[in-house]
Curated annotation (Swiss-Prot):
Its EC number is 3.6.1.-. A motif (Nudix box) lies at residues 38-59. This is RNA pyrophosphohydrolase. Its cofactor is a divalent metal cation. The keyword Hydrolase applies. It comes from Hydrogenovibrio crunogenus (strain DSM 25203 / XCL-2). InterPro entries: Nudix_hydrolase (IPR020476), NUDIX_hydrolase-like_dom_sf (IPR015797), NUDIX_hydrolase_CS (IPR020084), NUDIX_hydrolase_dom (IPR000086), RppH (IPR022927). SUPFAM superfamilies: Nudix.
């Protein structure tokens, strides 16, 4: 599903643990790390897409996390010219994303990268809050900075409510 401007609707998922560290996934067969993300299907809300992608890419259920916040508006990034598939119609020039900040309620053992035949990630780590901005592929750095800046204000919700169901 590509919009009229050539952007694919997508959700980005930032998972924070009790120590304030973020889930950081190593892409399969690549020397690249990123947050979980995925497309929003037709007739699917961004939040529904988050929980589907969370299960597909990280193996977590909605009960394993708490939604702490989301970006108010879509954030966009353009793909580098060499990654644009001009033979595909409609042509996708980038992604527009709603980002969600999720607090991890479960233990790390619940994380399972092998829920799909072809997993998105082959490894993962907990990293400091701002590490992803400098370490994601360059064309995503601005969107990561925008999302982390906007969602940082929601971090307090995780610790002030503690992990009470």
């Amino acid at each position: 599903m590509i919009d009229a401007d050539g952007y694919r609707p997508n959700v980005g998922i930032i998972i924070v643990n009790k120590e304030g560290k973020l889930f950081w996934g190593k892409r399969l067969y690549q020397d690249a790390w990123q947050f979980p993300q995925g497309g929003v299907r037709e007739n699917e809300t961004p939040q529904q897409a988050v929980f589907r992608e969370l299960k597909e890419e990280v193996g977590l259920e909605p009960s394993d996390v708490r939604v702490l916040g989301r970006t108010k508006d879509w954030l966009t990034y353009d793909l580098p010219k060499h990654l644009i598939r001009h033979y595909s119609q409609p042509v996708c020039i980038g992604q527009k994303q709603i980002w969600f900040l999720l607090g991890m309620l479960s233990d790390d053992e619940k994380i399972n990268l092998n829920t799909h035949e072809t997993p998105e990630f082959e490894g993962w780590s907990w990293v400091d809050y701002w590490v992803p901005v400098q370490n994601v592929v360059e064309f995503k750095q601005s969107v990561y900075h925008q999302a982390l800046t906007e969602l940082e204000t929601h971090l307090h919700k995780f610790w002030t409510k503690e992990h009470v169901g």
